[in-house]
Amino acid sequence: VLRWGDTELAPPGPGEVRIRHGAIAVNYSDVNVREGGFYIAKPLKFPVIIGNEAAGVIEELGAGAEGVQVGMRAAYVGVGGPFYENTGAYAEARNVPASCLFKLPDKISDDQAAAMMLKGLTASMVIHRYCKPQPGDAVLIHGAASGVGLLLVQWCKHLGATVIGTVGSETKAEVARSLGCDHTILYRDVDFVSAVKEIVPDGVAAVLDGVGKDTFAQSIYCTRRYGMLVNYGNASGHPDPLDLLLLAKHGSLIVTRPAFSDHIRDAHDRAHYSDELYDLAASGVLKVKIGKSYPLSQTAEAHRDLEGRKYAGSLLLKP
């Protein structure tokens, strides 16, 4: 249950800043926190303010807050602790550690930042640490019209890959194709394994999966010898346990399930990957698709639309 209401916000503590939100991201992890699902390391004491990602402007500094100033534009993705426990972005303003902030350049708007920081850095993690396709490689992207999926479609296409995407509707297929997806598969209507094999008989070099339970197990049969499966999200639920012998049987496959927080743990990495993301977005290599924006008071509607997979791209809340 989501309720709209007022709460008092204390002054920022030592090392913290108060950030006035301009745009707030709606992510599947927020739904999971709301439901008390598998991401949670320990039970939450409800009620809580959920949300992990937002962009805005710093309006007050706590003692000892370094590297920041009042009036600076910034974004954050988590606040440095357990990613799905230290929530609180679904608010007009919030106190966060200065150390968790990404400074925003003028070329990136609040809406762009909120729509792409978690999703874009997730795509960056997949590309740089696990699967950087070579020109001519075929890649299968599940949920190709999602926020992360659309960024992966564009990034893989930019690197010269043949991109195959699964989507839930023809409308989403059109969006994915418009941003570079070479082949789209309506996975609810056809067997996506057979459809992939018709396009690439030997299988794809990599499967990039943010859907999870509905797609991951069958993806083994889409992958070529020595291929890789990357599960980076679980929109349909956590994948079932995997028999490791299947990986040997179907071509010495590699499977990984990375943690986003590890990708941005190092300060140098945070700066490097965020700067790259800003440049790719500003140059038009990555176009950030915003499916819909909602007033913050209509958060429940935004969650219903996200769970119903109603829109392609990212959903935002506007304070």
Residue ranges and their predicted role:
Residues 75, 140, 205-208, 230:
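N-terminal Rossmann-like NAD(P) cofactor-binding module of classical short-chain dehydrogenase/reductase
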Residues 67, 76-143:
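NAD(P)H dinucleotide-binding glycine-rich loop of Rossmann-like/cofactor-binding domains
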Residues 191-201:
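Short amphipathic alpha-helix with an adjacent loop that forms part of the alpha/beta core around
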Residues 113-190:
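Mid-domain Rossmann-like dinucleotide-binding core that forms the NAD(H)/NADP(H) cofactor-binding site
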Residues 159, 167, 214-286, 319:
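Glycine-rich phosphate-binding loop and adjacent beta-alpha segment
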Residues 8-26, 38-80, 88:
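Glycine-rich beta-strand-centered segment in the early N-terminal region that forms part
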Residues 283-292, 300-319:
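C-terminal capping/lid region of NAD(P)-dependent oxidoreductase domains
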